[in-house]
């Protein structure tokens, strides 16, 4: 009998019941909640006269709708100008109070993007099953956890039963072998992976990311990679537990303490795929082939290295791809442009659940230090992923570096990742964004999003257009 993959181990250890139709009942260790997908779930509990099965297994924080300017944040919920956003945040506060669920509200320094808060609090732990009404819950797979997004009705189901009906995915291994080049980050790695396998390449799979190129990443970097597994079509992204994982978790508020810590670490050592484990699909990418990446179109798979020409629709042999490229060219306003450096940027956004952790901000600050934002740029904002990230960055003086360069230093939240708060693109505006999606209208109606790493976004803010950060930092 062959060994088990990490995904198999996590699945089997949480299997409550296997059903004849191929579905299974899976136990859920942690549910993260935010203001957008939880109101209907709580209302469902209320109408049915139910209580949460285990309140200690849920953690909430508002993130999608919260304003990020200091002026608006001083008043807490009352500072939210949009009435719908205000209702959603207020409703989360009320629901958490009524049902006894821990919430880091807008006035709590621990508030932030749910996928930043869970790990930094140690609420996300190796070996767990983690769900949230948000597709980027795959982020938590960086800890050797089985994590994925769920719908609102499923949010209610988990609140009521602490279980979920699921169908098991197949196993895919994406191995990044070798050593990454200077200034090539986790964001470049995952964009290159999506470019290679496509946005449907991981459909039906749980992707385990491995190889020396992945193992060399910090936990912040690993979270970036797993965060975008969903953009490759996979609900689940996983990375095996190692010393890097354990060191990150150690001492965090929700992490085990004392003898429980020692017992946990011993158990976590098995959270790796067995050497003889069989994967349904294996993809191998050479780390040294990965260069700084930039998306040019309206899908994460429309991505190229900074030094490559923008692909043209007329050069595509596949008629479906040709049509998609033509639409993307028109939407993105690329006529007359051949290289990414030809695109004049309007705004730069450094933040989101993909790239708003302290490591991301340190890298961006390193690039902009002693420089000034391009005069052609309308706006450049830096939005930390949580109040604790913000406090740490300010302790290190990173906010002073950003502000001296002309970037705005904001309060924590999802911000310009999506057009659900005051931070948006105008129609026809181009952004260099460290977020995870570049669909039509994602950052605002008619907005044109280019996904990049924090280093590339920082360099673009100074240059006013896309440049290779490797060349940029030399001058």
Swiss-Prot record:
EC number: 4.2.1.33
UniProt entry tagged with the keyword Cell division: no
Record: residues binding [4Fe-4S] cluster: 353, 414, 417
A family per Pfam: Aconitase
Cofactor note as given: Binds 1 [4Fe-4S] cluster per subunit.
Catalysed reactions listed for this entry: (2R,3S)-3-isopropylmalate = (2S)-2-isopropylmalate
Cofactor: [4Fe-4S] cluster
Pathway: Amino-acid biosynthesis; L-leucine biosynthesis; L-leucine from 3-methyl-2-oxobutanoate: step 2/4
MF annotations from Gene Ontology: 3-isopropylmalate dehydratase activity; 4 iron, 4 sulfur cluster binding; metal ion binding
A biological process term (GO) from this entry: L-leucine biosynthetic process
UniProt-listed Gene3D superfamilies: Aconitase, domain 3
SS bonds (residue pairs): none
Record carries keyword Amino-acid biosynthesis: yes
Top-tier EC class: lyase
Quaternary context: Heterodimer of LeuC and LeuD.
Family under the similarity heading: Belongs to the aconitase/IPM isomerase family. LeuC type 1 subfamily.
Function per UniProt: Catalyzes the isomerization between 2-isopropylmalate and 3-isopropylmalate, via the formation of 2-isopropylmaleate.
Record HAMAP family: LeuC_type1
Name listed for the protein in its UniProt record: 3-isopropylmalate dehydratase large subunit
Organism: Marinomonas sp. (strain MWYL1)
Lineage: Bacteria, Pseudomonadati, Pseudomonadota, Gammaproteobacteria, Oceanospirillales
Primary gene name: leuC
């Amino acid at each position: 009998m062959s060994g088990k993959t990490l995904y198999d181990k996590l699945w089997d250890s949480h299997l409550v019941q296997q059903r004849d139709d191929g579905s299974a009942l899976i136990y859920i260790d942690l549910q993260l909640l935010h203001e957008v997908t939880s109101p209907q779930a709580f209302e469902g509990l209320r109408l049915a006269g139910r209580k949460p099965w285990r309140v200690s297994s849920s953690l909430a924080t508002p993130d999608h709708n919260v304003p990020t300017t200091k002026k608006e944040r001083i008043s807490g919920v009352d500072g939210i100008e949009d009435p719908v956003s205000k209702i959603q945040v207020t409703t989360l506060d009320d629901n958490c109070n009524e049902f006894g669920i821990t919430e880091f509200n807008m006035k709590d320094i621990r508030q932030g993007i749910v996928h930043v808060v869970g790990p930094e609090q140690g609420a996300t732990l190796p070996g767990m099953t983690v769900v949230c009404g948000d597709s980027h819950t795959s982020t938590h797979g960086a800890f050797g956890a089985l994590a994925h997004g769920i719908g609102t009705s499923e949010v209610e189901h988990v609140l009521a039963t602490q279980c979920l009906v699921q169908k098991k995915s197949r196993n895919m291994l994406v191995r990044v072998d070798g050593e990454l080049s200077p200034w090539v980050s986790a964001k470049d790695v995952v964009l290159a992976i999506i470019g290679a396998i496509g946005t449907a390449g991981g459909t039906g799979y749980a992707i385990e990311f491995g190889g020396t190129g992945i193992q060399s990443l910090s936990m912040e970097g690993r979270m970036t990679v797993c965060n975008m597994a969903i953009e490759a079509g996979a609900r689940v992204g996983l990375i095996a537990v190692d010393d890097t994982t354990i060191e990150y978790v150690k001492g965090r508020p929700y992490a085990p303490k004392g003898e429980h810590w020692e017992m946990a670490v011993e158990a976590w050592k098995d959270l790796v795929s067995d050497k003889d484990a069989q994967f349904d699909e294996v993809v191998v990418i050479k780390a040294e082939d990965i260069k700084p990446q930039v998306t040019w179109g309206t899908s994460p798979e429309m991505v190229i290295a900074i030094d490559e020409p923008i692909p043209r629709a007329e050069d595509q042999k596949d008629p479906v791809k040709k049509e998609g490229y033509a639409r993307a060219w028109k939407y993105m306003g690329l006529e007359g442009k051949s290289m990414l450096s030809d695109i004049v940027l309007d705004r730069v956004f450094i933040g989101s659940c993909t790239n708003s952790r302290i490591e991301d901000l340190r890298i961006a600050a390193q690039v902009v230090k002693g420089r000034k934002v391009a005069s052609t740029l309308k706006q450049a904002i830096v939005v930390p992923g949580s109040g604790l990230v913000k406090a740490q960055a300010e302790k290190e003086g990173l906010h002073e570096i950003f502000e001296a360069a002309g970037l705005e230093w904001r309060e924590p939240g999802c911000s310009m990742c999506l057009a659900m708060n005051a931070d948006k693109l105008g129609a026809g505006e181009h952004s260099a964004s460290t977020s995870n999606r570049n669909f039509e209208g994602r950052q605002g109606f008619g907005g044109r999003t280019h996904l990049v790493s924090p280093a590339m976004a920082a360099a673009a803010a100074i240059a006013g257009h896309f440049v290779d950060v490797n060349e940029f930092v030399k001058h």
